[in-house]
């Protein structure tokens, strides 16, 4: 019973085409076969040595993030975005381990099939995707990690979003960004909207406090949970460019 409640609160897959890929040059591919997965992905090849491995948040799919893809294109950064099992046009059913496995498959595709140096990979995770990014970086070599609008762990965000459901405290402790950031050696850039009502900015401050090693925190004035790259404007874009260039090359 607890498992059913947990999944209903955690995973909200979306199959709607939001149109975010229609006007940008990209290739639509399938990845993950070596991991027993069938994942829909969008590949944006550019001239940079660095590459963004983009991990989107809950309630969305890869067609939702035009603003991010347009930013990466402006910065000349290659990007691989993919949908988790059960999201978008990817086969399967969502689960915590399934999300982690899909991220490993995407990294493997870049390293083993496209021959990218792992240190050229910049993980960019939004909201729930930040949890997948930090889990991957906790045991796999990458150049750097960028999170946007990411929470501390499943207990904290569950109690914040559903304070009227005390059962959340009895659910397994999952998506432990706080624990992962405490052990990740790769440089970290944490981005959070000042007005985020879904994940409070206090969680970003806590994550920054516990993060190990090189780390930066950017609180974007006037931004909510989903529009940091828009509200952040050129200043944020330049910070992202400088961070990825410094740690992953250009």
Can you annotate each of these PLM segments?
Residues 1-32:
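An N-terminal hydrophobic leader/cap segment in hydrolases
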Residues 73-91:
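Conserved alpha/beta-hydrolase
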Residues 58-71, 84, 93:
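The serine-hydrolase catalytic nucleophile loop
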Residues 183-185, 190-192, 196:
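Short beta-strand/loop motif that positions the catalytic acidic residue
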Residues 49-57:
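Short beta-strand element of the alpha/beta-hydrolase
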Residues 94-114, 179:
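Alpha/beta-hydrolase active-site loop
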Residues 223-233:
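Catalytic histidine-centered segment of alpha/beta-hydrolase-like enzymes
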Residues 109-113, 119-163:
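Primarily recognizes the serine-hydrolase "nucleophile elbow" in alpha/beta-hydrolase
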């Amino acid at each position: 019973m607890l498992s059913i409640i947990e999944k209903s609160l955690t995973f909200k897959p979306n199959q709607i085409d939001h149109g975010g890929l229609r006007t940008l040059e990209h290739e639509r591919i399938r990845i993950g076969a070596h991991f027993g997965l069938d994942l829909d992905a969008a590949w944006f090849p550019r001239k940079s040595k660095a590459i963004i491995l983009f991990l989107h948040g809950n309630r969305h799919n890869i067609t939702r993030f035009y603003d991010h893809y347009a930013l990466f294109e402006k910065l000349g950064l290659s990007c691989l975005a993919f949908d988790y099992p059960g999201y978008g046009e990817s086969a399967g059913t969502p689960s915590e381990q399934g999300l982690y496995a899909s991220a490993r498959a995407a990294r493997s595709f870049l390293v083993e099939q496209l021959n990218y140096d792992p240190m050229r990979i910049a993980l960019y995770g939004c909201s729930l995707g930040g949890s997948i990014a930090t889990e991957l970086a906790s045991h796999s070599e990458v150049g750097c990690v960028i999170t946007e609008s990411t929470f501390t762990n499943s207990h904290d965000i569950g109690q914040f979003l559903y304070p009227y459901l005390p059962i959340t405290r009895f659910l397994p402790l999952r998506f432990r960004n706080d624990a992962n950031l405490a052990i990740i050696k790769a440089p970290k850039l944490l981005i959070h909207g000042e007005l985020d009502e879904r994940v409070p900015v206090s969680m970003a401050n806590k994550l920054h406090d516990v993060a190990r090693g090189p780390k930066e925190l950017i609180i974007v004035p006037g931004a909510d949970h989903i529009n940091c790259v828009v509200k952040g404007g050129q200043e944020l874009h330049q910070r992202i460019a400088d961070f990825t260039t410094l740690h992953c090359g250009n």
